[in-house]
């Protein structure tokens, strides 16, 4: 089973983002993630046979906000900024593989051969900002793939202090 820990944006942040995307007009050239899949990954564990032991409950709750956008090859994302996020991600295992942690919310995917598709959208969304919110819990999520695409479901919840 493929597992990762994440923070889920609250409904008012989801609504603000949905409104912004509706205002911008969604580009069919991109494969947009449904709002039900929006999350901020903390730690990625990959295909593991059992649920890992995680010491996340009771950790300080980070204060977050969306500000700006960017791309990885084939991925359009929104930047997640805030106090306490890097520390929580580190506790969840981010960076254990030697890669630098980059807090983000994946919005869409596109053909890596067409980097301009993502770059244009990143520029359009660069000024998008949300009000800050406090993440009251981290979640362990399972990723499942079928003919309809990828879906995520919460396996465990870790309440945060704050």
Identify what each model region corresponds to.
Residues 1-162:
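Histidine-dependent nucleotide/RNA phosphoesterase domain, centered on the 2H-phosphoesterase fold
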């Amino acid at each position: 089973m493929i597992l990762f820990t994440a923070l889920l944006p609250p409904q008012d942040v989801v609504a603000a983002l949905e409104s912004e995307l509706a205002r911008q007009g969604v580009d069919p050239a991109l494969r947009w993630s449904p709002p039900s899949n929006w999350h901020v990954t903390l730690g990625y564990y990959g295909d593991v046979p059992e649920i890992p032991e995680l010491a996340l409950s009771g950790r300080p709750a980070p204060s977050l906000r969306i500000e700006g956008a960017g791309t990885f090859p084939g991925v359009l994302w929104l930047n997640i900024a805030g106090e306490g996020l890097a520390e929580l991600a580190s506790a969840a295992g981010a960076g254990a593989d030697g890669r630098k942690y980059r807090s983000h919310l994946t919005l869409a995917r596109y053909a890596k051969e067409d980097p301009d598709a993502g770059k244009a959208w990143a520029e359009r969304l660069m000024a998008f900002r949300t009000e800050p919110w406090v993440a009251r819990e981290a979640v362990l999520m399972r990723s499942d793939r079928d003919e309809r695409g990828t879906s995520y479901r919460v396996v465990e919840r870790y309440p945060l202090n704050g």
